From Swiss-Prot:
Catalytic activity: L-rhamnofuranose + NAD(+) = L-rhamnono-1,4-lactone + NADH + H(+); L-rhamnofuranose + NADP(+) = L-rhamnono-1,4-lactone + NADPH + H(+)
Single GO molecular function: quinone binding
Residues of the active site: 146 (proton donor), 159 (proton acceptor), 163 (lowers pka of active site tyr)
Pfam families according to UniProt: adh_short_C2
Organism whose genome encodes this protein: Azotobacter vinelandii (strain DJ / ATCC BAA-1303)
UniProt keyword annotation of NAD present: yes
Presence of keyword NADP: yes
The protein's name in its UniProt record: L-rhamnose 1-dehydrogenase (NAD(P)(+))
InterPro entries, alphabetized: NAD(P)-bd_dom_sf, SDR_fam
UniProt similarity note: Belongs to the short-chain dehydrogenases/reductases (SDR) family.
Positions annotated to bind beta-L-rhamnose: 146, 148, 156, 159, 191, 197
Gene Ontology BP, a term: fatty acid biosynthetic process
Length: 256
């Protein structure tokens, strides 16, 4: 197992990519903090995941911490330290993607998206990094960015800048935190079938068109991200920092 004796915080872990990542981290021996929004749906999803992890002999706790709350990172770190004594890995996954056209973008929607996807992430990364520095044995931070950090989207003008920002944050943090042995990397999912884009993918014609652009011939699934995230969290990636890993079935190179 790759993550034995490590404590891993995963934000947005009640469903989708975060859920798959948290589950696989637990399978690899980690003690997992399942971060969720605090909503009834988020709480239910996180608790069911904690039960699933316990069923195969893993260890996990569920913690409500809305990613839009700039203090959520401190809350997650405090919960991890209280329950498990340390923070070794942060997987910053929480994010929203409400599609909307540019010219009539509501200011509130823009601010909510940036607040959740980028501002919340910044301070969560900071909180985890401070704890890792204090512990004195390094650590790993993985941000779930997106292929949207590299390509535009007419209905995502409020979303793509946040994902580009996450990628840039990991690159800068790799430099800032390298002296403390803290590695910072980003994974860039392509089109992954999750709740966040369920409505967009419900159009079968559009779904088929999107699938046809992927060289591997299918859309991604949350579990497709779990392995790359575990790799970057583990000591197998001990000399990997400031990197960006596309997990898109070849979509980006095909778009080029």
């Amino acid at each position: 197992m790759l993550l034995i004796d490590k404590t891993v915080i995963v934000t947005g872990a009640s469903r989708g990519i975060g859920r798959a990542a948290a589950r696989e981290c637990a399978r690899q021996g980690a003690r997992v903090v399942i971060g969720h929004s605090g909503s009834d749906e988020g709480r239910a999803g996180a608790l069911s995941l904690a039960e699933e992890i316990a069923a195969f002999g893993g260890t996990a706790i569920a913690v409500g911490a809305d990613a839009a709350d700039l203090d959520s990172g401190e809350k997650l770190v405090a919960a991890a330290v209280e329950a498990f004594g340390s923070v070794d890995v942060l997987v910053n996954n929480a994010g929203i993607c409400p599609f909307h056209s540019f010219l009539d973008m509501p200011r509130e929607l823009y601010l909510k998206t940036v607040g959740t996807n980028l501002n919340g992430a910044y301070f969560t990364v900071q909180a985890a990094a401070r704890r890792m520095k204090e512990q004195g044995r390094g650590g790993a931070i993985i941000a779930v960015s997106s292929i949207s950090a590299l390509v535009g989207g007419a209905m995502q003008t409020h979303y793509t800048p946040t994902k580009a920002g996450l990628l840039s944050l990991m690159q800068s943090c790799a430099i800032a935190l390298g002296p403390y042995g803290i590695r910072c990397n980003a994974v860039l999912p392509g089109t992954i079938a999750t709740d966040i884009n369920k409505e967009d993918l419900s159009d079968l014609e559009k779904r088929e068109r999107m699938t046809s652009r992927v060289p591997l011939g299918r859309l991604g699934e949350p579990d497709d991200l779990a392995g790359p995230i575990v790799f970057l969290a583990s000591d197998m990636a001990r000399y990997v920092t400031g990197a960006s890993l596309l997990v898109d079935g070849g979509l980006f190179v095909n778009l080029q």
